[in-house]
Amino acid sequence: MTPKQYKYKAFISYSHQDKKWGDWLHRALETYRVPKGLVGKETGAGVVPKRLFPIFRDREELPTSHELGRVINKALDDSSHLIVICSPRSAKSQWVNEEIKQFKRLGKSDNILCLIVDGEPNASDKPGLEEEECFPEAAKYEIGEDGELSTIRTEPIAADAREGKDGKRNALLK
């Protein structure tokens, strides 16, 4: 079976308070050149392209529209991967949480990648550190048959761009 062809290589989900990270990631991904030895190789996700283009980011892609929810849902459906910029701000963002839930409802849970830029993973499990949580709730739980978050925990796939961790460059390569 031929893998689905997507309009976007990825959809970047982030809190607008993390706009500088969204700008950086969008630019870095769209200008990234895939190593020549990988280009053209057949994988389970299709043929490896020369560039990771286009990437959906709301400020870049969205027209001024009163039907924002419909446009966002269409873009999520048209995206191969969802990249979530994780920080205490995104962990509290209703929009980021909804985008993750919708992507999971589309059956693409395995294609969610997290980029930690601030805060602590799973801090909400530690009394007194709840405000430092960087993962949105929807990133930490599976979607149930009813389309809502279940009580079954999942471990997000994450690169860590924080200083002293992977750093920006290594996190991008991951």
Predicted features and spans:
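C-terminal interaction surface of TIR/SEFIR-family domains
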Residues: M1-E30, E60-S79, P88-Q94, K101-K174
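Short mixed-charge
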Residues: T31-P54, E131-G144
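Short, basic, glycine/proline-bearing loop/turn elements
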Residues: I55-D58, C86
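Hydrophobic acceptor-binding patch used for acceptor engagement in glycosyltransferases
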Residues: L82-I83
